[in-house]
Amino acid sequence: MDFWTAFQAIILGVVEGLTEFLPISSTGHQIIVADLIGFGGERAMAFNIIIQLAAILAVVWEFRSKIFEVVFGLTHQPKARRFTGNLLLAFMPAVVLGVLFADLIHEYLFNPVTVAAALVVGGVIMLWAERRKHRVEVDHVDDMRWSHALKIGFIQCLAMIPGTSRSGSTIIGGLLFGLSRKAATEFSFFLAMPTMVGAAVYSGYKYRDLFQPGDLPVFALGFVTSFIFAMIAVRALLKFIANHSYAAFAWYRIVFGLFILATWQFGWVDWSTAHG
């Protein structure tokens, strides 16, 4: 592994780790940065699976106490069973619709106009949701009802559209359906665990021939970098939302969406090589 390849792995690991759980679309950022540093092709597809898995494992580690509490409480704690049921219920729409439509969406919607439009529209909706007066019904994820979980699960499916942002859709959905910022954000993190692990396993199996032993050092470097920066991002976001709204992220989405349109319009980024 030469210096430039190591640099590419670190940069993309940082981008994935920082953007995966912020409501700003990690996909759009990965495409822009990967093109700018010349990291593409089949190796990039396999590499993306690895760094996404690293990011979700960072969340698993960050919330390990809650996970252990739920797992060991399933047999005797009603709140643990309710939480697990809500998580599975919210997860199912993405499974069904993902299997049915993922390939079609990847083929027909993965273009700069779609990504930019999703970023801008999502940013506008985020601003509206933050400024809209709504009654908080749920302050803690343990107090969610099954109806909250199911609605958030369907909202998460919007993230199949490039540029929407999985975390952005679930967090804003949670806010609109009566969750506090903290509860909506934490449930988004928990919902990411089965959703992203499932997606990584599915993609890993589908593209298993792309994984080559010679790429192991590159993958390992990207994995470690993504894990570390994802943990930093998760902790920072939880602290940020304690005293701030999501308005800053909304404006960032809008600006970034316009930036993507500019890169496409002026040919700064070759979107024809993007793989998602």
UniProtKB/Swiss-Prot annotation:
Keyword rRNA-binding carried by entry: no
Organism: Pseudomonas putida (strain ATCC 700007 / DSM 6899 / JCM 31910 / BCRC 17059 / LMG 24140 / F1)
UniProt catalytic activity: di-trans,octa-cis-undecaprenyl diphosphate + H2O = di-trans,octa-cis-undecaprenyl phosphate + phosphate + H(+)
GO cellular component, one term: plasma membrane
Keywords recorded for this protein, A-Z: Antibiotic resistance, Cell inner membrane, Cell membrane, Cell shape, Cell wall biogenesis/degradation, Hydrolase, Membrane, Peptidoglycan synthesis, Transmembrane, Transmembrane helix
More about this protein: Bacitracin is thought to be involved in the inhibition of peptidoglycan synthesis by sequestering undecaprenyl diphosphate, thereby reducing the pool of lipid carrier available.
Protein name: Undecaprenyl-diphosphatase
Broad class of the protein's primary localization: membrane
Stated family: Belongs to the UppP family.
NCBIfam families assigned: PRK00281.1-2, PRK00281.1-4, undec_PP_bacA
Function field: Catalyzes the dephosphorylation of undecaprenyl diphosphate (UPP). Confers resistance to bacitracin.
Compartment(s): Cell inner membrane
Annotated EC: 3.6.1.27
Record-level GO BP terms: cell wall organization; peptidoglycan biosynthetic process; regulation of cell shape; response to antibiotic
